[in-house]
Structure formats: C-alpha cells, structure tokens
C-alpha cells in the first residue's frame, strides 16, 4: 500500500477581510493542522492624541519577559503591548492518504 503526503500552507492576517476554505475527500485519509502565530510590525499610532499618524518602526514583537509573566505581553523593542503588533497565523495542514485499491 502506497502512502502519499499532501501539504497545504495557509497564511492569514488579522487585518485580512478575505477568507478561504478547502475540503479534501478521499477514501482513507487523515489530516492534522499545525498553526504558528507570529506578531510582526507594530501598528500603534503614537500621534493619535494630536490628530496625526506616526508609528515607531518596530518590525517584530520580542517579549520582554518569560511566558506566564506580565512582561511577556510587552515588546522589548518598542514597549507596546503585543496587541498593537500585527498578528500573522501560518496554518499548515498535512494530509496523509492511501489511494483506493483498483
């Protein structure tokens, strides 16, 4: 019996208005989904109180502390909360299936 492996990689952004979906049908298949979350550029508007728009240029979130502490949600580079950074979710779907016997 020959096993084949199919990988589909999806990338979603929190600001994305589009959504995509897919379905896979097969006689005998199993799949698993692996998600990797990254927080990239800071989008905090530092000039909002004067009616302007200015970002600090921070390109990627780096936690200021270890996981489980309050500092884990603060960026070591810019000092902003993690929610000000754009969230990217990379989802990897791995499907393993065996073709039906002919």
From Swiss-Prot:
* Positions of the UniProt region annotated as Disordered: 1-34
Q: Where in the cell is it found?
A: Cytoplasm
Query: Known PROSITE patterns for this protein?
Result: ZF_HD_DIMER (PS51523)
Keyword Protease present in the record's keywords: the answer is no
Residues in ZF-HD dimerization-type zinc fingers run 39-88
Q: Give UniProt keywords alphabetically.
A: Cytoplasm, Developmental protein, Metal-binding, Transcription, Transcription regulation, Zinc, Zinc-finger
Q: Where is the composition biased (Basic residues)?
A: 1-13
Record field: transmembrane: none
BP-aspect Gene Ontology terms: negative regulation of DNA binding; negative regulation of DNA-templated transcription; photomorphogenesis; regulation of meristem development; response to abscisic acid; response to auxin; response to brassinosteroid; response to cytokinin
Q: Name one GO cellular component term.
A: nucleus
Predominant location: cytoplasm
Looking up InterPro entries in the UniProt record yields: ZF_HD_homeobox_Cys/His_dimer
Give the compositionally biased regions (Low complexity).
Answer: 14-32
- Xref: Pfam families: ZF-HD_dimer
Question: Hey, what tissues is this thing expressed in?
Answer: Mostly expressed in roots and stems, present in siliques and seedlings, and weakly observed in petioles, leaves and flowers.
- Molecular function terms from GO: DNA binding; protein homodimerization activity; transcription cis-regulatory region binding; zinc ion binding
Job description of the protein:
Inhibits zinc finger homeodomain (ZHD) transcription factors, such as ZHD5, by interacting with them to prevent both their nuclear localization and their DNA-binding properties. Involved in integrating signals from multiple hormones by preventing the expression of genes involved in gibberellic acid (GA), auxin and brassinosteroid signaling and by promoting the expression of abscisic acid (ABA)-responsive genes. Regulates several development aspects, including photomorphogenesis, apical dominance, longevity, flower morphology and fertility, as well as root and stem elongation.
Question: Which NCBIfam families does the record associate with it?
Answer: ZF_HD_prot_N
Quaternary structure, per UniProt, is:
Homo- and heterodimers. Interacts with ZHD1, ZHD5, ZHD6, ZHD7, ZHD8, ZHD10 and ZHD13.
User: What name is this protein filed under?
Assistant: Mini zinc finger protein 1
Q: Tell me what gene encodes this.
A: MIF1
């Amino acid at each position: 019996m020959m096993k084949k492996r199919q990988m589909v990689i999806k990338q979603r952004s929190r600001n994305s208005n589009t959504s995509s979906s897919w379905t896979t049908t097969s006689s005998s298949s199993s799949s698993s989904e692996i998600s990797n979350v990254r927080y990239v550029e800071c989008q905090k508007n530092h000039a909002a109180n004067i009616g302007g728009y200015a970002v600090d240029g921070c390109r990627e979130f780096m936690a200021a502390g270890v996981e489980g502490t309050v500092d884990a949600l603060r960026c070591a580079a810019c000092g902003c909360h993690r929610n000000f950074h754009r969230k990217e979710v990379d989802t990897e779907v791995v499907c393993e299936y065996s073709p039906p016997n002919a």
